[in-house]
Swiss-Prot record:
One of its GO terms (molecular function) is nucleic acid binding. HAMAP family: tRNA_methyltr_YfiC (MF_01872). One of its GO terms (biological process) is tRNA processing. It comes from Pectobacterium carotovorum subsp. carotovorum (strain PC1). Pfam families: MTS. This is tRNA1(Val) (adenine(37)-N6)-methyltransferase.
Amino acid sequence: MSHQADNKLTLRRDGFTFKQFFVAHDRCAMKVGTDGILLGAWAPLSSVTRILDIGSGSGLLALMLAQRSDTHVRIDAVELDSAASQQAKENISASPWADRIAVYAEDIIDFADTRSADYSLIISNPPYFPPGIACGSAEREQARYTTLLTHETLLRCAHQLLMPDGLFCVVLPIQVAENFIPLAQQHNWYVHQQLRVSEQEDKPAHRVLLALSRQKKECVNASLAIRDEERRYSTAFQQLTKDFYLFM
């Protein structure tokens, strides 16, 4: 039996195994998924010195950015849910970057009110559904719905904490982004980069990754298909995520 097959048989079932770290997510309302992995692999890191992950959940984005960034870069992860923040701490403690990432179990509004604008990159995989159909648990509803963290609050807190030349990166469903972008512009944000993601080359985009700036810059637009027309992972998707996916 091949070494790769051996690895497949021993993968843990309570989380997600990446090439350089493991993310347990059994105590988190929102599990590791393609949206977060795309955002963590794509977010621009040029000249980054300090990073903030808002709504960190299991710590996925903080860990991905720690792997991608220089050793001097420090990362703060803020997560309101106590069970998720504890699991993020455990995931980070077990990773190679435990000394570079700090987890804060608090509301981002309170966090922003006690910090200065010294983050060069802020990243978030935010809730995107308005209150509606129940999710089955209060924790999952908190993670999925904008009840506790509205997009307006998210934009305001990020604006408060970001350095003037920094970037704020999010991933959203296309339909949600259609409302999010005008709202961001009302709060003095400018779209600097935009990656429209489709599930397959012949399908319309269903997600968008945004890099917002406090300064007006030329917007760079791009697109990415996760799979080709034969349902294989596309070359572009493999290139973007190959440092993370175990068998990519």
